[in-house]
């Protein structure tokens, strides 16, 4: 087989719709655009959300709330994630979490939640730990060091 002999699989391609090629084609004369009007023109049509002269929905609705610029965004992990990725006796910190692929970037810190079971004794050094997560880590023989 050569490069010039390659063909697409049978039935995987479709011929383009040929517009304006006579009334017998089914899409002749006005090419499926009807008669005159904004939608019949080249580049015609309205932008998304445009409702004619009516006030658009986005502007009819009241404004609400604000964005807190001091909000902290934690990377959230569960104890089951630690169970899957770490060996017994390991130290769980930013570097080790990055190495095993649990975090890609550190936003404002890492928080561990208590979903799942933990059987390995781990030393966890993160910013926040939920009460249930802390109980499970200690019950498995590990330590929690909140930085």
Curated annotation (Swiss-Prot):
Alphabetically ordered keywords of this record: Ribonucleoprotein, Ribosomal protein, RNA-binding, rRNA-binding
GO MF annotations, alphabetized: rRNA binding; structural constituent of ribosome
Top-rank taxon, per record: Bacteria
Pfam entry (one): Ribosomal_L27A
Region (Disordered): 1-58
Gene Ontology biological process: translation
GO cellular component: cytosolic large ribosomal subunit
Composition skew (Gly residues), residue ranges: 21-31, 42-52
Its biological purpose: Binds to the 23S rRNA.
HAMAP family tied to this protein: Ribosomal_uL15
Subunit structure as annotated in this protein's UniProt entry: Part of the 50S ribosomal subunit.
PANTHER family reported for this sequence: 50S RIBOSOMAL PROTEIN L15 (PTHR12934), LARGE RIBOSOMAL SUBUNIT PROTEIN UL15M (PTHR12934:SF11)
NCBIfam families listed in its UniProt record: rplO_bact
Family assignment from sequence similarity: Belongs to the universal ribosomal protein uL15 family.
Name by which UniProt lists this protein: Large ribosomal subunit protein uL15
Encoding gene, per UniProt annotation: rplO
């Amino acid at each position: 087989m050569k490069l010039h002999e390659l063909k697409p699989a049978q039935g995987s391609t479709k011929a383009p719709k040929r517009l304006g090629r006579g009334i017998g084609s089914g899409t002749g004369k006005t090419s499926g655009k009807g008669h005159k009007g904004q939608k019949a023109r080249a580049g015609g049509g309205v932008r998304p959300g445009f409702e004619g002269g009516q006030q658009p929905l986005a502007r009819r609705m009241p404004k609400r709330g604000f964005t807190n610029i001091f909000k902290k965004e934690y990377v959230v992990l569960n104890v089951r994630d630690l169970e899957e990725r770490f060996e017994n006796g390991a130290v769980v910190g930013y570097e080790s979490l990055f190495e095993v692929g649990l975090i890609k970037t550190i936003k404002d810190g890492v928080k561990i939640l208590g979903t799942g079971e933990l059987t390995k004794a781990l030393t966890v050094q993160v910013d926040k730990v939920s009460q249930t997560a802390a109980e499970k880590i200690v019950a498995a023989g590990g330590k929690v060091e909140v930085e």
